[in-house]
């Protein structure tokens, strides 16, 4: 069993990563339904919460069925982060996660996200202040370091633990790498193998297949996997990993009919939550993966991603179901 503070999780839990414009309540709920053990919100600006910015506040919404859920916030000003904690607490999440890993320039330029990797003392002080300011468990998501020459993740993780961080998720790249090259899980294993570490250490980055997840568990010895891009438009990924763990066999993927029905549910949930316009527009990014590998699909996909009218998108789903039915997508490669 793995525990984040008092939250009990199964051995080697699978966590849905916080992803901007992806990890919203509808998608999180679908991932939870399909095997995710913990889900995290999109990252939320502490300054946006303080200003009561509509987009930031909307990200605080939680469905009861998706628990345990962590709300992730980012910022570099301790006072602003503490004020945002008070706002977050009112929505009753299970966990508050601090984003010390986002590599995007507009975040880093303000010293937030991965930008704080240039100031480890501030990173630790901010974490300590937040731990003291709330009774909710504080967790951290970060990267190996700012660049290859500044990787001190073993020391950093221990310092975060010592000020009260209850779990740490580490992406196996530096900020300088962004998302290029391959994630290196070896430094994450060094964190886990530090005899002074006793909080869960979760790996993140390039967990793209059930086999890779098993490698993270069995070869690298981590406590769990945080899964991001592999789940976009494919919430089945979590159950497929768990099936592979139990049997050593790959679970047959969903039929085209099942994929279409999931996409339909996803769109309807998004509309119910965000309204028609945002629901239609922001669900589009999932369709490539929902229907990846279907031959001669371009015409159907264009209808899904170009129409602003949900009736047209639902009609496109109907045509796909009528055309392909319960067929399986041909195995690629």
Residue positions per predicted region:
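Flavin-dependent oxidoreductase catalytic cores
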Residues: 1-333
């Amino acid at each position: 069993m793995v525990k984040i503070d008092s939250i009990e999780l199964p051995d080697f839990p699978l966590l849905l990563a916080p992803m901007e414009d992806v990890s919203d309540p509808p998608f999180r709920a679908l991932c939870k339904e399909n095997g995710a053990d913990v889900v995290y919100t999109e990252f939320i600006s502490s300054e946006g919460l303080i200003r009561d910015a509509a987009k930031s506040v909307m990200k605080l919404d939680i469905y009861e069925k998706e628990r345990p859920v962590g709300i992730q916030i980012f910022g570099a000003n301790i006072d602003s982060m503490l004020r945002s904690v008070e706002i977050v607490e009112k929505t009753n999440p299970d966990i508050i996660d601090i984003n010390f890993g986002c590599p995007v320039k507009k975040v880093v330029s303000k010293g937030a996200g991965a930008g704080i990797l240039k100031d480890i003392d501030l990173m630790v002080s901010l974490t300590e202040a937040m731990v003291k300011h709330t009774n909710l468990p504080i967790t951290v998501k970060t990267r190996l370091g700012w660049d290859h020459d500044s990787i001190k993740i073993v020391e950093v993780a221990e310092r975060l633990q010592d000020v009260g961080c209850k779990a740490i998720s580490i992406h196996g790249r530096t900020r300088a790498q962004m998302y290029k090259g391959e994630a290196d899980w070896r430094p994450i294993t060094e964190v886990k193998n530090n005899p002074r570490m006793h909080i869960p250490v979760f790996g993140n980055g390039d967990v793209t297949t059930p086999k890779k997840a098993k490698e993270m568990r069995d070869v690298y010895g981590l406590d769990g996997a945080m899964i991001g891009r592999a789940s976009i438009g494919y919430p089945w990924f979590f159950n497929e990993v768990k099936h592979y763990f139990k049997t050593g066999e790959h679970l047959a993927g969903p039929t085209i009919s099942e994929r279409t029905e999931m996409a339909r549910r996803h769109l309807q949930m998004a509309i119910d939550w965000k309204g028609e316009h945002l629901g239609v527009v922001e669900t589009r990014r999932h369709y490539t993966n929902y229907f990846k590998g279907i031959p001669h699909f371009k015409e159907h996909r264009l209808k899904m991603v170009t129409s602003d009218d949900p009736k047209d998108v639902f009609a496109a789903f109907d045509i796909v179901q009528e055309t392909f039915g319960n067929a399986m997508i041909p195995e690629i490669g």
